[in-house]
Amino acid sequence: MRELRRVIVLFAAAVCLLSGCGAGVRPEGASGQGKQDVTIILKAPAQEMNCVSNPEITNTQAFLERVGQAFAAQYEDANVTIDVKMFALADEVSAITETFDTEDAPDILYEGYFNMAGYIHTGRVVPLDDMITDAIRADIYDSAWTISRTNGNTYMMPFLTMQNILIYNKAYFRSCGLDSYCGEGTEIQNWTMDEWTEILDTLAANLPEDVHPLAMYGKNNQGDTHIMSYLRAFGSEIFDADGNFDLESPEAVQALTWLQSGVERGWYPPHPENLEMKDCSELFSTKKLVLYNFNGANKSLYDDLSNYGFVNYPGDVATSFPNGFEIFDNGDDAKIRIAKAFLRYLYETPEWLELSAGNIPMSKTVSKKYAGQITMLSDFAANSSHVVDFMNNSPNWQGSSDSVRSVFYPHIADLLAGRVTPEECAAGLNADCNAALASGRERSVLHQ
């Protein structure tokens, strides 16, 4: 596969030389300063960031562009441009997989592990152990390195993580007579399933007509991981001992039944099958929704934290979204070398590494320095026992038309629309999601 990519790169270079590369465009390697001109494409989904070390950084684009400019300014072996390209969360496949073997292919990717991990099995993601110094390795938590390795090689560089729970508007709880369920301060609560049902029914019966109790959506795969959390509500692990989905268990079917019942009981905004997560985000930020997904990074959702409460997903479940970097082999050794130098520079420069503070840093040094300034850090730490491994080290999670994330959400949309029964939904999920896993295992190849 790598040799094919080299042929493509060499062929493109030959065509470029024959055609003169177009007026006014300097081909890579033709710098008048004697240094090679190299453009590194760094892609990332558009996301908010909460950076306590530099409040001017409010999103991933600002973070990556600043680091890229600083790296290029100090790099001496080539004239480097870090071309930061953002994409919408729902456009992952078109932004990444469909650009492989094109001029728009990413050299570096920054995003959540739940998407990045799948690319490792394409054979395009390079191991990073040769760029990780002893100092970098010692500064990152051991647990972060563990989830960054496959078959003993480190394919992902951990930067920060976010713990996913739910946030709720206390004012609506109080106005609906649910004062007793409001937590103290920023504690992360747990409610029994009977309590969950009582709370949602009470909200549905007493809220203003244009305000809805709970976020729910099924239009696309945005936020599908949070929907999977609900499938654990009655005790399902959702995977069996062999690593396959087990969504036809009594516990999983009970969770699907509970979810579907919320449509008729008025728990969700109308026609949730036609909504995506960002629709619910807008509803929550405009106080038209009571409970929504939360991880500390989405500061635009709330004003004063004291006005809100926090609770694990039904079944006392939380998840964790590690974010970090990986490097792709597009057939150009120079780009791989520079991409590794970029990551090493980022992790060895406190100004940039400290931008992980605000979320939960993977760096011990950063965590210690900013412990008192990171939103709910101690609460998230105390809640870590409720965090589940939602991916189960599964291949083909994202990145193809038959991936888990491509086939999961249509079944949830059908469930919410009433087009299928919970039992039919469970059978469809098992069939399609396990077919995705089987396909991923069959196609899996690792870069050495």
Protein language model regions, located:
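Short helix-initiation/N-cap motifs at beta->coil->alpha
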Residues: 86-95, 114, 190-195, 271-285
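Periplasmic-binding protein-like
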Residues: 170-172, 207, 344-367
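Hinge/lid segment of periplasmic solute-binding proteins
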Residues: 88, 111-165, 174-176, 194, ...
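Short helices/loops that flank or line small-molecule/ion binding pockets
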Residues: 93-105, 122, 173, 197-203, ...
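Helix-loop-helix "hinge/cap" segment bordering the ligand-binding cleft or interdomain interface
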Residues: 77, 133-135, 148-222, 236-271, ...
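Conserved N-terminal structural module of periplasmic/extracytoplasmic solute-binding proteins
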Residues: 10, 18-117, 137, 334-337, ...
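Extracytoplasmic/periplasmic substrate-binding proteins
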Residues: 40-50, 57-60, 66, 72, ...
